Amino acid sequence: MRNYYLTDGTLENFYTAVFDAYKDGNACLSSAPSLQIGLGDGFFRVQTDESKAARVMTKIRGLDGRALWEIDRILRANAPDKEQAAYLYLRVLIESGKPARGNLANPSVRRAMDICAQVGTEVHRLKGFLRFQETADGVLYAPCSPDNDVVDLLMPHFAARLKTCSFIIHDVWRGVAGIYHKGEWLVTAAGEAVFSPSERERNFQSLWKKYYHTVTIAQRKNERQRRNYMPVRYWKFLTEEPN
């Protein structure tokens, strides 16, 4: 028999669930919209309680402040077990009373660190793979479809490098966009984008494609290695890739 605690995907709700479930030896935390629950299993829809969440976060901060950062990363992942992985990791941390990330012999710690690393790897990749296009209005637009919810993790990086530009990073899969203008940025819901590239953008794209294919040495192509360094899911957003 298991008791399922359904969260709404927010940090505060997750930490409330940790508080509610901690003394439950059969707890399973999840934000999945559909769960397969067996006969006799319990089901609880978690209601956010800021006081409970704050108590849990204060406890964690006192043991290992970096763990709060790790939990934030884990909960951004596109992994069906992310809440449970984060919860079990926190149990190890609280029960040991000291940082647990180095205890990779523990499967709960290892799974949590794997998910955390996957999110970090995608952020790192997108800093290099993201392609901005200049619209006719002069705004730079970069569509993407990351595995994980990382748009707001990308915004500070590009805001620091494109200070004088207005730009949009659009997660077309989740329907959210990071918008930067005059030193400030926010992340908001966004539908399908419709825009016209500027004349300069069309010229640059044409030149870049010609350059990319001109410098390619056919005899040295290694598609397997290419896929390892540049996952196929990013290709459709790259200027140099044919449509």
Labelled PLM ranges:
Residues 1-50:
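N-terminal ordered "arm"
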Residues 3-10, 44, 107, 139-150, ...:
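Conserved aromatic-histidine-acidic binding/catalytic patches
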Residues 13-24, 87-95, 153-160, 206-213:
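Short, hydrophobic/amphipathic alpha-helical patches that form generic packing surfaces
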Residues 25-26, 63, 67, 82, ...:
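Short secondary-structure junctions and interdomain/linker hinges
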Residues 31-126:
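Charged, alpha-helical interface segments at or near domain boundaries
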Residues 44-51, 185-197:
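Acidic, Ser/Thr-rich peripheral helices and adjacent loops at domain boundaries
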Residues 99-189:
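Internal, well-folded beta-alpha domain core
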Residues 166, 177-178, 182, 196-243:
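Long, compositionally biased intrinsically disordered terminal regions
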